[in-house]
């Protein structure tokens, strides 16, 4: 864990004008970037640097796959992020090329974008918290992928099934944001018999955290005295949502498995298995999300 240091404000390049000053390497790079931006603006070149120098810290962290931008904000506010040895508490702090950025003391490197589909086994946690003693998704996948990735959304510890993994924060934001409404399908194993009448009632939805959640689809796959199997598709993403909706109708879930995310099915992926997404799968998933939100 990075020790919290007193937050320092940036000094203007060139110092205060009182006495001789020495530029740090970062000040030199900032000055060069500013000069380049000003030059680009004068000659009419459309350049990102002509408007701002560097990249916002929260955006930079998300782009490197640390987590979604919202989660990166939380890490910054929590004092987990340092730049060049100084803890930064402002998500809008500008990161320059060559800056040493660390999260919990671990240096974050710029790398290529990674996208994977993973089958999370039951009992595994969707967290990167190093203080956690239970098995985490990252403990299983880190040896199998060429860079750091995070889970796109969550599955609770007792659930199993499909998870997307990436180091692309923008992709993660698109897939998880409620306005995009990516459909996810679950198979739920109930520990008692239920009827088609029970299913009809549950199709009306239930209030979860003050918001009414209505399944996109809900069907009874089988039912007997020993138990029942239900398939539910939703486009929300609240904590333990499927279990909570069914519980409103006295359906007690003993096992839950996510079998589909958008256009991606479980197919031949075994528990603990992982595979990269194809470019077409990734592009189709993003297009599906944007279409659902009306951005297409």
Q: Residue locations for each model-derived region?
A:
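Basic, flexible Lys/Arg- and Gly-enriched helix-loop patches that mediate nucleic-acid binding at interfaces
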Residues: 25, 32-296
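Charged, low-complexity terminal tails
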Residues: 1-37
């Amino acid at each position: 864990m990075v020790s919290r240091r007193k937050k320092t404000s940036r000094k203007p390049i060139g110092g205060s004008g009182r006495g001789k000053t020495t530029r740090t390497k970062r000040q030199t790079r900032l000055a060069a970037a500013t000069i380049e931006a000003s030059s680009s603006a004068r000659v009419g070149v459309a350049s990102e640097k002509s408007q701002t120098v560097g990249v916002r810290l929260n955006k930079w962290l998300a782009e490197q796959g640390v987590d979604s931008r919202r989660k990166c904000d939380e890490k910054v506010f929590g004092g987990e992020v340092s730049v060049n040895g100084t803890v930064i508490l402002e998500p809008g702090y500008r990161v320059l090329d060559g800056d040493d950025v660390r999260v919990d003391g671990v240096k974050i490197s710029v790398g290529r974008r990674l996208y994977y589909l993973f089958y999370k086994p039951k009992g595994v946690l969707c967290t990167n918290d190093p203080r956690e003693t239970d098995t985490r998704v990252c403990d299983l996948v880190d040896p199998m992928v060429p860079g750091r990735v995070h889970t796109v959304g969550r599955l609770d510890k007792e659930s199993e099934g499909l998870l997307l993994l990436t180091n692309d924060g923008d992709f993660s934001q698109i897939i998880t944001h409620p306005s995009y409404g990516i459909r996810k399908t679950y198979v739920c194993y109930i520990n008692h018999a239920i009827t088609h009448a029970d299913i009809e009632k549950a199709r009306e939805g239930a209030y979860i955290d003050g918001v009414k959640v209505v399944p996109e689809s809900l069907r009874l796959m089988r039912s007997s005295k020993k138990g029942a199997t239900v398939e539910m598709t939703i486009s929300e993403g609240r904590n333990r949502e499927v279990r909570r909706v069914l519980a409103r109708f006295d359906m007690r879930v003993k096992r839950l498995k996510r079998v589909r995310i958008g256009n991606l099915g479980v197919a031949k992926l075994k528990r603990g298995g992982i595979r990269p997404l194809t470019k077409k799968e990734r592009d189709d998933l993003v297009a599906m999300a944007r279409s659902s939100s009306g951005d297409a």
